[in-house]
Amino acid sequence: MAPSFDTLSEQDLHEEEEEEIDVSDLKAQYEVKLEEGLDTFVVIDGLPVVPEESRQKLVKFLMRKLNTVGHTSEDAVFMPVNDKNMSEGYAFVEYETPEQAVAAVKQLHGTPLDKKHTLLVNKLMDIERYGREGRIDEEYKPPTIEPFKEKEHLRSWLSDPNARDQFALYRGDKVGVFWNNKNNPPENVVDRAHWTQLFVQWSPKGTFLASVHPQGVQLWGGPAFSKQKQFPHPFVQLIEFSPGESYLTTWSARPIQVEEGQPILSYEEDGKNIIVWDIETGKPLRSFVSHDLSAPGGESDAQPKKKVQWPAFKWSADEKYVARMLQGQSISIYELPRMNLLGKTSVKVDGVMDFEWSPATVNREGVKQYEQLLCFWTPEIGSNPARVAMMSVPSKEIVRTRNLFNVSDVKLHWQSQGSFVCVKVDRHSKSKKSMATNLEIFRVREKGVPVEVVDSLKDTVINFAWEPNGSRFVLITNGETVAGAAVAPKTAVSFFAREKKGGAAGNFKLVRTIEKKNSNAIYWSPKGRFVVVATVHSQTSFDMDFWDMDFEGEKPEAEKDLTANVQLMKTLEHYGVTDIDWDPTGRYVVSSASAWTHSLENGWNMHTFSGNTLSENPTEKFKQFLWRPRPPTFLSKEEQKQVRKNLREYSKEFDEEDRYAVDIANTAVVEKRKRVLSEWIAWIRREKELLSEDKDAYGLPEDVDDPKKAKDAPAVTSEQGEAVVEEIVEEIVEESEEVIG
């Protein structure tokens, strides 16, 4: 608020008196921080009280605990002694770094020293900060207990009687959530201005909608989208949810500066870039410095700035582990919810370039113990070949490796159920003048994890995508770019499926290749079978091809032995398309052109899975379209089987409901037209009544409106101040046209 006379205090009115000037804000700003330099010290309470001659023995015993979380020495432990030559039951300990002191507080606080004594560990600067005079009220005041408030149902949208889906729209400075109504206009649920400053993002199961602000992240949910949680992270730029919505990761390029008195962030987060949060409690679990922003000392000017790797932390399928990579050196795996390093050490992997968790918990053949799988790759180093490896966690055992040669780049693609991992290997020729791609497919569920090689590709693969919950995939290849060519080379789209071998599936085989395309993106339906292959972020091509992988028509003879029947259903164009999104049911597809990419014809179009356009929605300053995800089904496998068995009966009910909805819509239109007609007739009747009253008032006959009689009627003259009513009628008797000159 801007200062004004109304906001001045009584003391401010007498500011000419020097002794009454309030300089508390200046004192706070320039106050010498006594804790500076003390951030490596901790205070340990709860120690045994021993005589001075036993003090050194106690220190040595205590060192066993202290050195498990950092590095300190006996000389760095100070244990005060009183006048009776007895210790006071506490000690001051100095660690080498502030991080070690923080680790000591986190890991040693509350741990037993022996059967009778429990360690209480605090930072020395905390004692100074919170124990300073005036910081603690000496008089006990009972805490205020807030009245109970019933929580909103965070998954209420799933109980919609018509099983509709919701989506979020971000346009201009407004964010809205809407129901999808098929052919009819969407129904608004909530629409708010300035709801976010950067972007919005749904949580993986659709429970929360996250908005991003300079102060941090807020989560919204429930029928009215009320505020549920907030996570303070100044100038946050990126966020990532864990698969089960238990945790949230936030990142900012600016190191955090924690102000004193901040209720949630502590000195532990000061100077960090990344925070891992517990969504349920709203509290940070641990904070980290971003690897991408730090450069070796003295080399920061010479080295180019690294691209930020996001997500910086990757989650296991069951959220029990989260891992982070220091590129070229190691992979650090943390156990949740404590966020302690698995085995207290990182996994050293020289040259590691990337890693990916399996998106599902996999039961490998012959393996009975619990495990999560992690795949990583390393480049060629000296005479050592490039390597792809699969690691089992928590044992950290390497269960499969594959050596690769002449490697330029590798991309790891897990199938959604963790049954396969495709290693896309870009290889260069010995002369390094040409590139080609081959696929190394790990069959994870089979004994020994065999690897199948697809080496029939002649060009470089620029995009690859597995069918969700399936064993088919689509890829796009790109020919070599001719130096100096003004036009980019054409692409080719290839469809792959497995062979039929008796009752089991065999190797992966090419089904069909579509040449001379401009496609660069692949979007599978979340339910599989249907796929959109499109050209996005292009200035010259905007095609969207809708494909069916299980076409029910006749199958070509050459594809009889393959588990696919590929058919192009429709091709559409959407000028300037930048994004394509499937709804969670796989029935609808939205193509959109975002103002974040360009400012030409922004908006979004709704299509069916087969490519029929339902609506076109040009929207000024359109930015984001996001379908609300659905959680996994709550039905058991037996119940799902029963639903599929009775699907035809359910379909009849759904068709009847659709017809009823159309009838209601038509009835509404008819009723509206009837209402408008009734209003028009009532208005005509009312006007005629008023006109009749006017005729009686002026003594006019009822048939005065007849034009013929009105022409011959004499003018009414005014006598004694009465008004004269006169009607003039003109008629064109003859019309001639004369041309002059």
UniProtKB/Swiss-Prot annotation:
The keyword RNA-binding applies. It is found in: Cytoplasm. Residues 40-126 form the RRM domain. WD repeats lie at residues 193-230, 232-289, 303-344, 514-557, 572-610. GO terms for molecular function: identical protein binding; RNA binding; translation initiation factor activity; translation initiation factor binding. GO terms for cellular component: cytoplasmic stress granule; eukaryotic 43S preinitiation complex; eukaryotic 48S preinitiation complex; eukaryotic translation initiation factor 3 complex, eIF3e; eukaryotic translation initiation factor 3 complex, eIF3m; multi-eIF complex. The keyword Lyase does not apply. Residues 1-22, 695-722 are annotated as: Disordered. Gene3D superfamilies: 3.30.70.330, YVTN repeat-like/Quinoprotein amine dehydrogenase. Keywords: Cytoplasm, Initiation factor, Protein biosynthesis, Repeat, RNA-binding, WD repeat. GO terms for biological process: formation of cytoplasmic translation initiation complex. Residues 1-10 have a biased composition (Polar residues). Disulfide bonds: none annotated. Residues 13-22 have a biased composition (Acidic residues). RNA-binding component of the eukaryotic translation initiation factor 3 (eIF-3) complex, which is involved in protein synthesis of a specialized repertoire of mRNAs and, together with other initiation factors, stimulates binding of mRNA and methionyl-tRNAi to the 40S ribosome. The eIF-3 complex specifically targets and initiates translation of a subset of mRNAs involved in cell proliferation. Belongs to the eIF-3 subunit B family. Component of the eukaryotic translation initiation factor 3 (eIF-3) complex. This is Eukaryotic translation initiation factor 3 subunit B. It comes from Aspergillus clavatus (strain ATCC 1007 / CBS 513.65 / DSM 816 / NCTC 3887 / NRRL 1 / QM 1276 / 107).
